[in-house]
Design a protein with these regions (language model features):
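Long beta-strand-rich cores associated with HINT superfamily self-processing modules
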Residues: 554-581
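Extracytoplasmic/peripheral linker and loop segments enriched in polar/acidic and small residues
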Residues: 180, 353, 388-389, 446-460, ...
């Protein structure tokens, strides 16, 4: 799961207990339903509102709280309890047979779309079918393609091409893989391999229902149909989104969601300092920032050790989130291992971390893409002992000397016109860019040119192979408590977030063979050890420049309560926020 904050991405470690510095906001006896809840963001839009295209943790948390339902979900609760799997559209967590290759679910009674029409198995199958239209429905997770028992053609592509193509499209294969009962109440998934935690996969909005008659292809992103407690009244990117109550939603058929405010407004394009000052001054006590807090304002809310100041108790938190940040090196363009390593050793990471607020707020230096909270999937990476927080120019220059001999073309590019570095357009990232540029030039002779991209458009750009630069900032967290949702997703060519573009790297065939074999490994301990070994393999080839095991800060107005950090989505549980008065 990718991060949409600054630039971090995906779902939390389901078994971890995230440290919450401030705790759960207390509920007052006078709180009631009603009023308008406001969210503020510097982004010009959500990354995606279309459920099949939604793959950033905060957006998953937001839309799954207010609009989009799935067969299963996570319990709305703080701490480790929030990682408990619960039934949503389904009556239970499913029945697995055939060595976990067949999964059956029954839909609850009374579940409907916003127009009152019933949600059926066919609607869920149609929603999932959109994932296969990879030329139209972009940026979302691809678990359906990798897990469902739909044959591949000679080129390794699915014989089913999605709902928008007719010629040569094997629709019967979809119907066999997702079988619906005659009454539309029972849905059976037939998988190509054993997946013991498939019911966790179904928490993703990409497995949610879409009414075929309302599907508008890529334009569905602007007006998706709701199955949750709210529906869209207005969505105007660069302006605002307004949600109002869905009169056809019933708490009786949706026991896991709340519907406290009458209206929810998201204001886009708010300058970062203006956004922060609205919350800091409490000029809008019903408002919450969606972007965290500028590093320059952290000491107003928190003590130097990261704890919440007394006057901000109940209005802010500073938590370890599930994300790992990194800079994906586009190996198809920077196909020179010594240069990739030189970038890692040359950067002044200490200064970059200070811009992010230091370790009390930014987090801890990462050694790969798997966080220690993953337990048996994590093992400390070796071979990085020459890393220095301030940069290691001696090591970096030696690597550049090697690159000059072994890959002169890439060396000439890096030291000449330079490498293009994609990142989100924000004040903090612009400050960090200066450090990157100066330290790589000084310590390795590498020239960098930054490509600053508007936040709401960022992933659409960097996941487009024709538009991505040489290096791209990103962040990821496991989709559930298994690094099968990290390593393959980030580095297999068919993964959901393959920004490193490693398919033509000489080291890729071995990685591909081992990763695909490990997806089939039934012994969880052996599987975890191999994910840790493949994390080491990734770092041996420096397919990413590791960043941080991150922390997140949120703050909100004085009239809000019920705010807590929701572990599995790495974001607040937005649907539990209410107005005090």
């Amino acid at each position: 799961m990718g991060s949409s904050r600054g630039i971090r991405r995906k779902v939390a470690v389901a078994a971890s207990a995230i440290l919450m510095v401030s705790g759960l906001s207390a509920c007052s006896s006078g709180s009631a339903e009603g009023g308008t809840l406001t969210f503020l963001t510097f982004a010009e839009s959500f990354t995606h509102a279309d459920p099949q295209r939604n793959y950033t943790g905060q957006d998953l948390a937001w839309f799954s709280s207010f609009m989009h339902r799935t067969l299963t979900s996570y319990k709305r609760a703080p701490g480790a309890e929030g990682s408990e799997l619960v039934a949503d559209l389904a009556t239970d967590l499913g029945t697995a047979t055939n060595d976990f290759k067949t999964w059956e679910f029954t839909l609850r009674d009374g579940v409907t779309f916003e127009d009152g029409s019933p949600i059926t198995c066919q609607d869920i199958r149609y929603g999932i079918s959109r994932t296969y239209a990879t030329d139209v429905i972009t940026d979302g997770p691809t678990y359906a393609i990798s897990m469902l028992d739909i044959p591949k053609d000679a080129d390794g592509n699915s014989v089913y091409k999605g709902p928008y193509k007719t010629d040569g499209n094997d629709t019967a294969a979809l119907d066999k893989a997702i079988n619906c009962s005659e009454d539309g109440k029972t849905i059976t998934f037939n998988l190509s391999r054993s997946v013991a935690d498939f019911n966790y996969t179904l928490t993703y909005l990409s497995f949610g229902p879409v009414p075929q008659a309302k599907d508008t292809g890529d334009q569905y992103d602007l007006a998706p149909v709701s199955s949750g407690p709210y529906k869209i009244e207005k969505y105007a990117p660069k302006d605002e989104m307004v949600l109002v109550r869905n009169e056809n939603w019933s708490k009786d058929s949706d026991p896991i969601r709340n519907a406290y405010p009458d209206k929810i407004v998201v204001r886009f394009g708010i300058a970062e300092e203006v956004r922060d000052q609205i919350i800091l001054s409490d000029s809008e006590p019903n408002a919450m920032s969606l972007d965290g807090i500028l590093p320059t304002n952290l000491t107003t809310v928190f003590n130097d050790d990261g704890t919440v100041k007394a006057e901000w108790e109940g209005r802010a938190h500073n938590v370890y989130d599930p994300y790992v940040t990194y800079s994906a090196v586009n190996v198809s363009k920077v196909n020179c291992l010594p240069i990739r390593k030189a970038i890692y050793y040359a950067r002044d990471f200490g200064s970059i971390l200070q811009i992010a607020g230091g370790q009390a707020f930014g987090g801890d230096p990462a050694d790969g893409v798997i966080k220690p909270l993953m337990g048996l999937d994590y093992k400390k990476v070796t071979g990085l002992e020459d890393f220095k927080m301030e940069g290691n120019p001696e090591k970096a220059k030696a690597l550049m000397d090697e690159a000059k001999k072994t890959c002169p073309d890439v060396y000439a590019k890096a030291t000449g016109k330079g490498l293009v570095f994609d990142t989100v357009d924000s004040d903090t990232n612009k400050k960090a860019a200066t450090v990157w540029i100066d330290s790589l030039k000084k310590n390795a002779g590498i020239n960098l040119k930054f490509n600053f991209i508007e936040a709401g458009s960022y992933y659409a750009v960097v996941l487009d192979r024709t538009k991505q630069g040489d290096i791209s900032r990103a962040g990821w967290a496991p989709d559930w408590a298994n690094a099968s949702t990290v390593v393959p997703e980030l580095f297999l060519e068919e993964g959901g977030f393959p920004m490193s573009q490693v398919g033509k790297d000489p080291a890729y065939p071995e990685f591909e063979k081992r990763a695909k074999a490990n997806l089939l490994e039934a012994d969880r301990a052996k599987q975890g050890a191999e994910w840790a070994a493949l994390n080491q393999y990734v770092m041996d080839n420096m397919w990413v420049i590791p960043g941080l095991f991150t922390k997140s800060q949120d703050m909100w107005g004085s009239n809000l309560e019920g705010v807590f950090f929701w572990e599995p989505q790495g974001a607040p549980s937005f649907g539990d926020i209410k107005l005090k008065s």
